């Protein structure tokens, strides 16, 4: 073979190799670099999350004034600055605003290709607020007491809380995805529980569709997160229904599609104990076994265990995919837990509960 031909082949081969290397390098840069700054910032924020020792110190506050003062060296300081009367309601609102600020920060600092997911996560608070307001209205309770100041449609939610009639709420919801389900509720075509399920079904469908539209690591992480949340919702719905002696046909409309576990066999068991036994063979078996005895007396124990399982799973994914969307998801879950615990401490202090008992109760609430 002539020297020129050999040189040509070598040049072509080198060009192909360098093109491939360049492509792979560009893919790595595109995939990981956008997470470098936000994840470093989130890790720094994670280091500031309150320790168990700090929660115990807060439990010793005895007054809400002291509780607020004790948080002045934390990221809650600016949100608590508006507290003047030191009521538990004021403090809860401030903590809710702090949590909302965390969601908003994620939307701001994360790559554009994933930050819409965090906007969608805020819609869960819309669903919670809408259902809470309507439940309160139906039993003639002050609906504004149940509004959490987080979500994408807070002004509408507050208007709903102030509405004089149930029909007025329909006008407020006009043009939103919630208009049609609410109209069915007003007409008596669906029950309040079915209305709530429909809103969650719509919410999780949005999340899952978004997750499935992603590729590679982002799809793996987002899909796992959404399906875990759906599983948690379905398991708790099913067990509460079994505790209430509901039949399979009554429960089916309350199940949200998109979870990882098959529920058909569990739907047809006779009671809560048998349902727990059926769940033992699923991926959640170990979680349930750890709290089995307590669960039969108090289902909130399982809710906390499932929340903990989801947090642990996101932490695992954070270690496996350090420069990924797993880090902000893990942080959001930890922040939600922190705010729940702070709200619980504030409420217990307001109720005059002794510090040692507060520590026990808040530790259980983790």
From Swiss-Prot:
UniProt keywords, alphabetically: ATP synthesis, Cell membrane, Hydrogen ion transport, Ion transport, Membrane, Transport
GO MF term set: ATP binding; proton-transporting ATP synthase activity, rotational mechanism; proton-transporting ATPase activity, rotational mechanism
Gene3D superfamilies given in the database record: ATP synthase (C/AC39) subunit, domain 3 (1.10.132.50), V-type ATP synthase subunit C domain (1.20.1690.10)
Localization (cell): Cell membrane
Principal location class: membrane
Membrane topology recorded in Swiss-Prot or TrEMBL: Peripheral membrane protein
Family matches, as Pfam families: vATP-synt_AC39 (PF01992)
GO BP field: proton motive force-driven plasma membrane ATP synthesis
Subunit structure: Has multiple subunits with at least A(3), B(3), C, D, E, F, H, I and proteolipid K(x).
Family per similarity comment: Belongs to the V-ATPase V0D/AC39 subunit family.
Function: Component of the A-type ATP synthase that produces ATP from ADP in the presence of a proton gradient across the membrane.
Protein name: A-type ATP synthase subunit C
């Amino acid at each position: 073979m002539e020297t020129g031909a050999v040189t040509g082949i070598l040049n072509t081969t080198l060009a192909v190799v360098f093109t491939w290397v360049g492509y792979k390098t560009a893919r790595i840069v595109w995939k990981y670099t956008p997470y470098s700054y936000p994840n470093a910032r989130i890790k720094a924020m994670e280091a500031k999350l309150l320790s168990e020792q700090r929660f115990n110190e807060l439990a010793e506050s005895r007054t809400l004034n002291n509780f607020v003062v004790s948080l002045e060296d934390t990221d809650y300081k600016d949100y608590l600055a508006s507290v003047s009367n030191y009521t538990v309601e004021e403090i809860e609102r401030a903590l809710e605003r702090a949590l909302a600020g965390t969601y908003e920060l994620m939307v701001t600092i994360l790559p554009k290709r994933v930050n819409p997911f965090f906007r969608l996560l805020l819609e869960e608070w819309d669903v919670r607020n809408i259902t809470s307001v309507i439940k309160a209205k139906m039993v003639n309770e002050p609906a504004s007491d149940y509004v959490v100041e987080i979500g994408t449609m807070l002004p509408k939610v507050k208007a709903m809380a102030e509405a004089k009639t149930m029909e007025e709420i329909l006008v407020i919801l006009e043009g939103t995805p919630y208009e049609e389900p609410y109209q069915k509720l007003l007409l008596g075509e669906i029950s309040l529980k079915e209305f709530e399920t429909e809103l969650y079904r719509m919410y999780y469908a949005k999340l899952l569709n978004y997750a499935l539209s992603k590729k590679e690591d982002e799809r793996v992480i987002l899909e796992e997160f959404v399906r875990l949340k759906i599983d948690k919702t379905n398991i708790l719905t099913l067990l509460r229904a079994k505790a209430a002696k509901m039949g399979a046909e009554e429960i089916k409309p309350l199940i949200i599609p998109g979870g990882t576990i098959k529920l058909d066999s569990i739907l047809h068991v006779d009671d809560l104990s048998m349902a727990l036994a059926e769940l033992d063979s699923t991926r959640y078996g170990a979680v349930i076994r750890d709290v089995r005895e307590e669960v039969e007396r108090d289902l909130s124990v399982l809710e906390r265990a499932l929340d903990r399982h989801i947090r642990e799973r996101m932490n695992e994914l954070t270690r496996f995919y350090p420069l990924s969307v797993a880090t902000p998801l893990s942080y959001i879950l930890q922040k939600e837990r922190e705010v729940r615990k702070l709200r619980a401490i504030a409420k217990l202090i307001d109720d005059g509960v002794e510090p040692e008992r507060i520590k026990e109760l808040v530790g259980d609430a983790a």
